[in-house]
Amino acid sequence: MGCVILESLEHLEPLAGWKPVAERVAEMPDDPDATVWHVCWYQVDEASLRERLPALARAMRPHWYAHFWADDDLCVVLAGRFFWARASDRSTWQEFIAYGDSVGVERRWTENISTQLPAWVEAALRRSAPWRRSPLDPHVT
């Protein structure tokens, strides 16, 4: 699972063919880079992610990041580079935190990357479950 804010990318080509499982528009009036964020969550397999990581890193703007995880594997994409770490071991985060400093990503972001889905994303995943037949079906909860 991963989160990409569309405004974080110079262009959207690295996301071609990936369909968000959840999307939200957030107003960020105090952000100097983008006052509106299009927050997209993607469920992608590891092979697809690994194939696209270099392109995502090249397209990532300074001051921004994206992140993906599965189990305890955490991948953080920053401008020009991507990093693998263990989500449960903060000592493995130091390299991407330091690099984030160099590309203008504040530590309040890089030191607090969540591997928990927001409730609104969990709800979207439940609504889009492939076994659902119809929202009007009384047997679907």
Show the residue positions of the predicted features:
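Terminal targeting/leader modules
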Residues: 1-91, 116, 121-141
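Mixed-charge, glycine-accented linear interaction segment located at domain edges/termini
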Residues: 93-114
